[in-house]
Amino acid sequence: MKIIAVGMNYALHNKELGHTHENKEPVIFLKPDSAILKDGKPFFIPDFSNEIHYETELVVRINRLGKNIAPRFANRYYDAVTVGIDFTARDLQRKFREQGNPWELCKGFDSSAAIGTFVPVEHYKDIQNLNFNLLIDGKEVQRGCTADMLFKIDDIIAYVSRFVTLKIGDLLFTGTPVGVGPVSIGQRLQGYLEEEKLLDFYIR
């Protein structure tokens, strides 16, 4: 199982991080399976970063083997969605960007991919028009809608499958909207999809 993630997929988030360049193709990076955090287990802040940020995202679960998938058929290759957190060591990310180095160590560290309970796609009328949000200690800190994605889910799947074979159980983190920020020990994070709580855990 692998975790495929999309960077810079919401215009306002790109602006808040100072990215003004318009990408013609999705920005893709990978996380190892050891990044998965699930079942409400706590997230432990690592000792190599002083600035861990939350990034709330819609996560798509792949359910078929696929290669060179046409966009019009991409919806056949996933069966469920949830809310996830792409934890990012922002201080390391800034350093790596300055050095021109890859993102893996600031994005793919252990437990950096928190996922909630998956819901069958049939539960929703249109997954390309879903609202999701994150609460920290009961206060909303981030909200987004999949309609605002720069690259849509089916197009991302088609694009990635040109380079990497998709396998059953792979996860696709589809990008984060505006409103990212730091986490600290003791906080409770709750993620919602269409006002249904799917993710609930603590920072330790």
Q: Where are these predicted regions, by residue range?
A:
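Catalytic-core "active-site belt" of small-molecule-metabolizing enzymes
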Residues: 1-171, 179-204
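Switch II (G3) loop of P-loop NTPases
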Residues: 176
